[in-house]
Amino acid sequence: MNLEDLQQHLITKAHNCAEEYTRLFHGRGNAYEGYRFLTVDSADNVLFAVLFDADAKEEAIVGMLRDLYTREGKWKALVVQQRYLPSSPSALIEGELPHACFAIENSLKYAINFQSAQNIGFFPDMKIGRSFVREHAQGKKVLNLFSYTCSFSAAAIAGGAASVVNVDMNKNVLSIGRENHRLNGLDTKKVAFMPYNILKSWSRIRKAGPYDLIIIDPPSFQKGSFAASSDYEKIIRRLHEFAAEECLVLSALNAPELGTAFIKTLFRENAPEFHYVERLPNLESFPTDNDERSLKNLIFKRGA
């Protein structure tokens, strides 16, 4: 793929995008030779590009994005993040950022911030996972582990969940999670926000159970608090303590070095009462040359 091919790809994708958060170009899956370092998103009225590595084509790519921004006339701002630099700075290249920015998905709004941190507050590749939770949440008690900004929780409440418990050790992201519920007019009386280290808070988690639907969506690595390769099994080993008799589990992992066999083995060895149901498909807008290195959303069920 050359720069002209990339430009044409973006023009084609941009014609079909509306207000919903859309991945226009996904190079991270290595499906496009020479562009593994690049992603481009349309987030409501912002064109947002992330450069994960330094590359000689960077200046030309930013110039092409300026042209796309001007040509299409559908965005209010162009933001480019240099993820490879310390603190992952984002620069406003064109236009003016709205006072409040949102990711819109399946009629729900999530607050996002393009200039405050490495991550904007929303992971678009998890759309099918959120849809699954929304479709299966009716009347259920839901546990959302590593809840981040609580998008799963908002989806669950929108789907009729009886209650949701969100657990994340970062109070700031839980505050954004509260706001995400408020943005959508969702009743937070049904929602708990627990700012705790999950691996040290099992008694609190058990107290609010048992849960009918459990979401496990950890970072692959978080210095000092979680490493999927060694800590994921500590969660699986505890599931029987707070899972309802017919509990559904969405077990997610986005570590390229750990495949589906890793999660299946953890369940087989540590929670044999749960059987594997399926792996949810990933979005077509996130192509990959190796499915085992991409996002893995595995569904397990306790009981019949």
Residue ranges and their predicted role:
Residues M169-I215:
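S-adenosyl-L-methionine
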Residues S163-D168:
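Conserved SAM-binding motif I beta-strand of class I
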Residues M1-D44:
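Non-catalytic accessory regions of SAM-dependent methyltransferases
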Residues G139-Y148:
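Conserved class I S-adenosyl-L-methionine
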Residues T149-A161:
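Conserved SAM-binding loop of SAM-dependent methyltransferases across substrates and taxa
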Residues E33-G34, L38-T39, E58-F123, S131:
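Non-catalytic substrate-recognition/targeting regions of SAM-dependent transferases
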Residues I263-A304:
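Class I S-adenosyl-L-methionine
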Residues I198-N270:
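S-adenosylmethionine
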